[in-house]
From Swiss-Prot:
Binding site for heme b: H213, H275
Membrane association type: Multi-pass membrane protein
Name of this protein: Heme A synthase
Primary residence: membrane
Any Gene Ontology CC annotation: plasma membrane
Localization per record: Cell membrane
Biological process according to GO: heme A biosynthetic process
Domain comment (free text): The N-half (TM1-TM4) and C-half (TM5-TM8) domains are connected by an intracellular loop. Each domain is formed from four-helix bundles and they align in a pseudo twofold symmetry manner. The N-half domain is the substrate-heme O binding domain and the C-half domain is the cofactor heme B binding domain. The cysteines of disulfide bond Cys-35 and Cys-42 may be involved in transfer of reducing equivalents from quinol in the membrane to the active site of the enzyme.
Lineage: Bacteria, Bacillati, Bacillota, Bacilli, Bacillales
Residues that bind heme o: H60, H122
GO molecular function list: metal ion binding; oxidoreductase activity, acting on NAD(P)H, heme protein as acceptor
Functional description taken from the UniProt entry: Catalyzes the conversion of heme O to heme A by two successive hydroxylations of the methyl group at C8. The first hydroxylation forms heme I, the second hydroxylation results in an unstable dihydroxymethyl group, which spontaneously dehydrates, resulting in the formyl group of heme A.
Residues that span the membrane, as ranges: 7-27, 62-82, 92-112, 121-141, 159-179, 209-229, 243-263, 273-293
């Protein structure tokens, strides 16, 4: 397989990660209006004034635009080069369509303004584009290996975990994005409960938003542990499934730890960006599991 195509896949995947982290940086630093109501220009000019907010917002737009070109190039190239692989064309379309959607949503928020409910979708839409690019890149590397042609087994319980967890993870991601866009990150200053001084249950809207996300994340944490234990017991000989769940377990632990650190560090930017990074990586792996389930079901039907 063309080494240049593999290189493009890796670069595009990393670029999309920067888009996700950059979006989180914009939100965490309150830089969403750093370029005013102007788009694609920044305060009516190509280059922004030298303020922190405008530089962060302009940089995010620049990285997103560059990533858009890379995603389009990867989609076209993989379509031509490995279009015979069943998932390629679907993923190519998904990567481009959802990247355009997230760009339009971001632009609309700048020009017209938007509610927290709508803006919380921005990160989730970007996640789908990132996962599509990641899977496209994996297909490129897979085309040179024998893994795709190997038969494998996924039982009903594991299929339930793989499908259920990816859907539920997307819900949890939305609640986390809603926490950011409603400025609820520090609504509860203790952990695991909201406050040991004013009672353990939340009393205000922002506290309910924060605790709702924590409750949803706790269930996801427990579910991934259960799936990882099942994989360790039943799928140790199937490396993709076994190691996929082991890595997912590590990522969800890091995700939880960074979330707790955000609270106790009083919104340290490094921990906040790590929180976005870990969930992005986890979502990518879970989407790969979804790909495996689809392949297994086709394998059974043959």
């Amino acid at each position: 397989m063309n080494k240049a195509l593999k290189g493009l896949g890796i670069i595009t995947t990393i670029a999309m990660l920067f888009v996700l982290i950059g979006g989180a940086l914009v939100t965490k630093t309150g830089s969403g209006m750093g370029c005013g109501r102007s788009w694609p220009l920044c305060n009516g000019s190509i280059f922004p004034a030298l303020t922190l907010e405008s530089i962060i917002e302009w940089s995010h737009r620049f990285v997103s635009g560059t990533s858009g070109v890379l995603v389009l190039a990867l989609a076209i190239w993989t379509w031509k080069k490995i279009g015979h692989i069943r998932e390629t064309k679907f993923l190519a379309v998904m990567s481009v369509v959802f990247l355009i959607l997230q760009a339009l949503l971001g632009a609309a928020a700048v020009v017209f303004g938007s509610s927290a409910l709508i803006m919380a979708l921005h990160f989730g839409i970007s996640l789908i584009s990132f996962a599509s690019v990641l899977l496209l890149t994996l297909l490129v590397f897979e085309a040179d290996s024998k893994q795709k042609s190997e038969s494998f087994y996924i039982g009903k319980t594991m299929q339930f975990h793989m499908i259920g967890i990816i859907i539920y993870t997307y819900v949890v991601v939305y609640t986390g994005a809603y926490v950011r866009h409603t400025s609820s990150s520090l609504a509860c200053l203790d952990f695991p409960m909201c406050s040991t001084e004013n009672g353990w249950l939340p009393g205000k809207f922002h506290e309910w938003v924060q605790m709702g996300h924590r409750a949803a994340a706790l269930l996801l944490f427990a579910w991934i542990i259960a799936a990882a234990v099942h994989a360790a017991r039943q799928y140790k000989n199937q490396k993709r499934i076994y190691w996929g769940w082991m890595i997912s377990l590590i990522l969800i632990i890091l995700q939880a730890a960074s979330g707790i650190a955000v609270v106790y560090s009083r919104l340290d930017l490094g921990f906040a960006l790590a929180h976005a990074f870990f969930i992005s990586c986890l979502f990518g792996i879970l989407c790969y599991f979804l790909l495996l389930v689809a392949r297994y079901r086709r394998q059974v039907q043959k």
